[in-house]
């Protein structure tokens, strides 16, 4: 007799049921919190009658199997693929199945995709009743089992600052099936020794995590060191099971519900400038029904030199009123939910992973959704002929010089932020008032989401 030991478990995911190879099947490096199983439903029939000696027996019938359940954790391990020279993670199939209903296309721009700078995940193509299906193969010692037609229900990044960056995955499948034969050679499909040694330098230290949180209405950025947090992506999957008399039924399929990208943050309550107390006061003071914050968690920190990091971005989040946590050191807890620009936009947020992020590429990722796409870092406002004075009723064309010149989106919005002697339109044409004089401050704000601004003062004179 032999027993199966959990420590000898290996997990594989595949997009196919036959013809397994390294392009359609992937080994997942999991921790010891792995679990899987499938329970059932039954009906008890009892009788209830009067009299001194009633019938008290009962019968039980098996009705159906619930959807098979599974969950496990993986470390976040971005590395450079030796074959493509692009950034990748060992569990990229999971990220794709979480985010898209199409076949995997790492060369694309939605779901899971990559380039030489970073591996990215967005949710712009997740409006499907059925997301990309995976089949999970479980090898424990020499015993194989298989969970058929799985959808990933949830992925949660738990930012425990004493831990290593990891993701907890969970979901369901139609049925858990023991296999009599080996479906493929695990040593041929599994992660090779060279790749395993490569990713040893990719572990991410949560202790270095940075929170970037900015009020999008006031452009006010807060500086809050966190003590913990979560970042959760949920597809709200439900399974459909028939109900046939005299037969045990199994689930026949699954469907997505509302997509949710939510999170929570904890921090000590401090009174420093732009700290957690100031955020608390600002939210209490305004009491907005709807607010808008850009939230980014930078796991692994940001540096001028290249370091492994994971960036979790809620591009437009609604932040709940924080709660006060009473402990030896007073703290605060903040809950948030990412909101799309339109209900069908799929732009709630995105994630980026790289073994070589820098301060610049992290900013690019937060602004553009891709660390390889340059964001605006500075704006110089200019005027035609470089003039600084303008006669009443005259016009002056304003323009900008954007840094870096390689920035993808160089468009700006124009505004007058001080003075009333002139107005400016959407194209940057400044028009002096016919009767007023004085200085006006012309401001240009980058449209790429970076929030970068530039200003120039023009003085309106009576002329001569």
Swiss-Prot record:
Its main location: virion. SUPFAM superfamilies: Invasin/intimin cell-adhesion fragments (SSF49373). Residues 40-59 are annotated as: Disordered. It holds the Pfam family Big_2. GO terms for cellular component: virus tail; virus tail, tube. GO terms for biological process: symbiont genome ejection through host cell envelope, long flexible tail mechanism; viral release from host cell by cytolysis. Polymerizes to form the tail tube of the phage. Tail tube protein polymerization takes place around the tape measure protein (TMP-pb2) and is probably directed by chaperone proteins. The tail tube is involved in viral genome delivery during ejection. This is Tail tube protein pb6. It comes from Escherichia phage T5 (Enterobacteria phage T5).
